[in-house]
Regions:
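Conserved substrate/cofactor phosphate-moiety recognition/catalytic segment
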Residues: 23-70
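NTP-dependent small-molecule kinase module
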Residues: 143-201
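Conserved glycine(s) of the Walker
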Residues: 20
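The conserved Walker
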Residues: 16-17
Length: 201
């Protein structure tokens, strides 16, 4: 029997500022996988945002060149990291995405303010709104490049998974804020099957 080599994997935690990506990362990033994060770089090296972002980008590119596995967190509001994921897939990487969003950017604004009050990093309000709109508009491309993609609405106390792509098969789940038509618009996917993605019993 032929030995099939496992593809190298990238795990990406994506979504607008203040959606709650970091909480997902803490729980779901495998301990054996290197985690590349600009906020951590900024804190450790005491550099500014731009320098930290540039260092993180160089690290991701270096890992990609060496075909090494890694995990990273991104707002994904521009095509830069989307381009990296597309290149990675062409190189034979397996792409796993956890996308964390909210139903309204005002939630993100308040969460960032709460984070700052607790000593966390700030993001200007106008940037949160602008990035939210751009990030949401790119979701169909994120879904397309991912081998596995989970989308969670993290507006409430408990996150609610509204969508899952497993290879080429897609599933959705509904709640008050998310019905099928809205999930189709968000993801660009119309061929999907309803499934309990939240183990409600």
């Amino acid at each position: 029997m032929e030995n099939v080599q496992k593809k190298p994997e990238i795990i990406v935690f994506a979504g607008p500022n203040g959606s709650g990506k970091s909480t997902f990362t803490e729980i779901l990033c495998p301990p054996q996988m290197d985690y590349i994060n600009a906020d951590e770089i900024k804190k450790n090296l005491k550099c500014d945002d731009l320098e930290a972002a540039q260092i993180a980008e160089r690290q991701r590119e270096a890992y990609l060149s060496d075909k090494r596995e890694f995990c990273f967190e991104t707002v994904l509001s521009t095509s830069r990291n989307l381009g990296l994921l597309n290149r990675a897939r062409e190189m034979g990487y397996f792409i796993r995405c956890y996308y964390v969003l909210t139903i309204d950017p005002i939630i993100n604004v308040y969460r960032v303010k709460a984070r700052v009050a607790s000593g966390g990093h700030d993001v200007p309000e106008e940037k949160i709104y602008a990035r939210y709109d751009r990030a949401m508009a790119l979701i169909p491309q994120v879904v397309a490049v991912s081998d596995i993609c989970h989308i969670y609405d993290n507006s409430e106390e408990e996150p609610f998974r509204i969508f899952k792509k497993q290879k080429e098969v897609c599933f959705y789940d509904v709640c008050d804020d998310w019905q099928r038509e809205k999930i189709e618009t968000l993801t660009g996917i119309t061929d999907m099957e309803r499934r309990d993605l939240n183990h409600r019993g």
